[in-house]
Amino acid sequence: MGMQCNTKLLLPVALIPVVIILIGTLVPILLHEQKKAFYWRLFLQSQHVEAPITVTQGDTVYLDASNNPCNYSSFWYHGNCELCGWNGYLRNVTHYYTNTSCSPQFMCINETKGLQLYNVTLNDSGAYTEHVYECDLSCNITTYNEYEILNYFDNCNYTINSTKHIITVVSSRHSKQTNSHVSTHAGWAAAVVTVIMIYVLIHFNVPATLRHKLRTRNNVNRIA
């Protein structure tokens, strides 16, 4: 009888470590899947956005990365030329790759995964598109070794978000002409408003002045 009781007690005790191991294994997986689902909904809110921008020749333009939770899956393109992206051949995988063969003068911002265009010319007008790829990466990449990260980046092949910045570069002369036109229109508007105000003042004040003169003349005649 005593042996049967001990056996019944040992079975739940033996199951406790198994339950703890299962919980320790399943909870991180469930949390990770929940986080992925949240980011997926976040990305879909701004999928395929177009943002028009007008700048003057010689300006510097900063293009921020869109909502990308860990900033490890953004790639920038100008036409068919990849400006910024991840280079699998770099030993330090936390740095952005800059493709110097592309025509605009630009710099890839490693900290924000954004793009900076400097000293823009008229030829730099066009679409600059940021593609965000789905990568099964945690926010802390130090948990992966180099080869694991490169394998993950090789599998980042599904675009879930893209932002197209349509940049129009205008010449400084055009900008000055525009400012001149704005100033001219503002001057004409001020002149018209002034004329209207003078007309209103004259219209209301002249009859009042005449009435005052007539009243004064009548008073003089009565006294006489």
Swiss-Prot record:
Location (main, coarse): virion
Keyword Transmembrane: yes
Annotated TM spans: 186-206
Domain of life according to the entry: Viruses
Keywords annotated in UniProt: Glycoprotein, Late protein, Membrane, Signal, Transmembrane, Transmembrane helix, Viral envelope protein, Virion
GO cellular component labels: membrane; viral envelope; virion membrane
Membrane topology category: Single-pass membrane protein
Annotated InterPro entries: Ig-like_fold (IPR013783)
Region forming the signal peptide: 1-25
Subcellular location: Virion membrane
Record: glycosylation sites: N71, N92, N99, N110, N119, N123, N140, N157, N161
Similarity comment: family membership: Belongs to the RL11 family.
Protein name: Glycoprotein UL1
Annotated organism of origin: Human cytomegalovirus (strain AD169)
